[in-house]
């Protein structure tokens, strides 16, 4: 099986290195490609480099660094960089979960979505970490990811235009839960940077996902992660609110 790895934390991030090591040890891939952004693109969503020159640097015959977004990286990988399309795309392992509203911002999910857009099985993978220490433990992916990939690849009813969004909890995993996305109210952790010019100020958004204390009433993947479960959520492209659409059509 030919597997393409990408991410949104950048080519040199520890998460994608851990992912490659897991895939190698699992023995599920006969060929592994890595095509990932040059820089950290967290929060980039599905933005692409349109009408701009995008530099692609070859590291090896199967490893490339793209000076652009996660979506651009995979878009080019599938159309220009790889000699054959992959059988599977794995995006991650992201430094931090992508749960609830996170999926709208996530470059990790977006990279996987580029594969799903042309019906290639695509899985986004994220790992919760300790916000205080910043340390990330890869034990849960190392223990469970091979099993999850094999399970999903054997699901006959998986519509390949659907992204499978997998999140690993910080604590030792209690098991796996298939969950809906869930939702939260974004937090307001914004720092105003020092400036002597009041007419030209800058801000740093330091956090969007609320901490566990402030998301206690949340449901779906958010609740399951906080309870210590690995979550798997199928995500589709069509975001139409069909209930509202039906009501709008009744206005005719």
From Swiss-Prot:
Its EC number is 3.1.3.5. It catalyses: a ribonucleoside 5'-phosphate + H2O = a ribonucleoside + phosphate. One of its GO terms (molecular function) is exopolyphosphatase activity. The keyword Ribosomal protein does not apply. It is found in: Cytoplasm. It is an enzyme of class 3 (hydrolase). Gene3D superfamilies: Survival protein SurE-like phosphatase/nucleotidase. Binds 1 divalent metal cation per subunit. Keywords: Cytoplasm, Hydrolase, Metal-binding, Nucleotide-binding. Its cofactor is a divalent metal cation. It comes from the Bacteria. One of its GO terms (cellular component) is cytoplasm. Its main location: cytoplasm. A divalent metal cation binds at residues 8-9, 42, 94. HAMAP family: SurE. Nucleotidase that shows phosphatase activity on nucleoside 5'-monophosphates. Belongs to the SurE nucleotidase family. This is 5'-nucleotidase SurE. It comes from Ehrlichia ruminantium (strain Welgevonden). The gene is surE.
């Amino acid at each position: 099986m030919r597997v393409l790895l990408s991410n949104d934390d950048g080519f040199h991030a520890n998460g994608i290195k851990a992912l490659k090591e897991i895939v190698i040890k699992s023995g599920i891939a006969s060929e592994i490609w890595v095509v990932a952004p040059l820089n950290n693109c967290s929060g980039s969503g599905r933005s692409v480099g349109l009408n701009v020159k995008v530099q692609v640097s070859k590291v090896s015959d199967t490893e490339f660094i793209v000076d652009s977004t996660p979506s651009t990286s995979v878009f080019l990988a599938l159309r220009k960089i790889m000699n054959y399309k992959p059988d599977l795309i794995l995006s991650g392992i992201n430094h931090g979960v992508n749960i609830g509203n996170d999926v709208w911002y996530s470059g990790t999910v977006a990279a996987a979505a580029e594969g799903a857009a042309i019906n290639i099985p695509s899985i986004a993978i994220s790992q919760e970490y300790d916000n205080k220490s910043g340390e990330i433990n890869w034990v849960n992916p190392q223990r469970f990811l091979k099993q999850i990939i094999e399970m999903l690849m054997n699901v006959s009813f998986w519509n390949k235009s659907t992204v499978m969004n997998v999140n690993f909890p910080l604590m030792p995993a209690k098991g796996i839960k298939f969950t809906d996305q869930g939702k939260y109210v974004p937090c307001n952790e914004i720092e105003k940077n020092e400036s002597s010019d009041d007419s030209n100020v800058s801000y740093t958004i330091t956090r969007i996902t609320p901490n566990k204390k402030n998301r206690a009433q949340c449901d779906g993947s958010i609740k399951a992660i906080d309870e210590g479960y690995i979550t798997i959520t199928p995500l589709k492209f069509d975001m139409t609110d069909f209930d509202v659409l039906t009501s709008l059509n009744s206005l005719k």
